[in-house]
Amino acid sequence: PMRERLFPRWCTALFALLPMSELLYLPADGQSVYAAALACTVCALAGIGAARLSDRVRHSAPAQWVLALTSLFPLLASIARMSIFLQKTVFTGRSCGSTVVLLTVCILLMASMGLNRCAMWALPIAWLAGTVLLLSGVLTLTQLTPASFSAPTAALLPQFRHILYSLLPASVVLAFSLPETRLSASVSRGLSAGGALLALLLLRTVLLLGANTAALLPYPAFTAAGLAAIGNFARHGEVFFAVPLLLCEIGRCAALVCVLLYPFTRTCGVLHLRRPQ
């Protein structure tokens, strides 16, 4: 049925969530933009290759178990960093354990729809996040200081490795798990679009806060978003900025849970997808 088909635009949106999920946590300095752009390019190329092999992987039980085990690492890393972020910024009075439980419940509820419908919901989430991020950038455009811009140097390599370590496993695991090899172009488009937005917002952070100040902050992009406001309506611009990005990461985690459970359920979801009679 149509609802169980993974359309290319849904796939594009799902993979666009992956780079955008990184924005809240990345350090920002003069080399961040180049490191992010390079890492997302590598992930897009790796994702194309993985998607083209997805048909073989789907019919191999050992490969499915390897994917399931591999998906655990980016999944647990995402839940941990979301919990720490929320505890330090929003839920300062709550324990980290309660935040982990709350996030896990949200992720499992979304994963219960199955991978295809997770990708379907990724489309409005990606549009919401993209719109909010671009609006945040536009509102701070007049406050940017181009003097903070710097040319690429070898100092970008540590950040490149850091972003690649965080982004590549989820990108490759999800690309290998796609139901059709023809979706490889959607993988590339999604990672490229999300990567471009990630690089632009990191650039905005550096030009707005200055490279030295941004490098000292634990969540520089979140702090920079707090300077975007529309009168009294959005005085806490960082909240409007963070919510869609957290939704991006919950969507990413839900898709990884679908991959994790596939060897047990033989469907890409917690609940068995209905089949035509």
Residue ranges and their predicted role:
Residues D55-P62, L115-W121, P179-G190, T265-L273:
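Membrane-interface helix-boundary motifs at transmembrane edges
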Residues D29-G30, R58-H59, A151-T153, A228-G237:
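Helix-boundary and loop/linker segments of multi-pass membrane transporters
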Residues L6-L24, A36-G47, L67-S71, L75-S78, ...:
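Hydrophobic, membrane-embedded alpha-helices of multi-pass small-molecule transporters
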Residues L24-Q31, M82-F91, Q143-A155:
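Membrane-interface helix termini and inter-helical loops of multi-pass transporters
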Residues F7, F73-S83, W127-P152, T205-V206:
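Hydrophobic alpha-helical segments and their helix-loop junctions in multi-pass secondary transporters
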Residues S54-G93, S112, L245-C268:
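Hydrophobic transmembrane alpha-helices that form the core helical bundles
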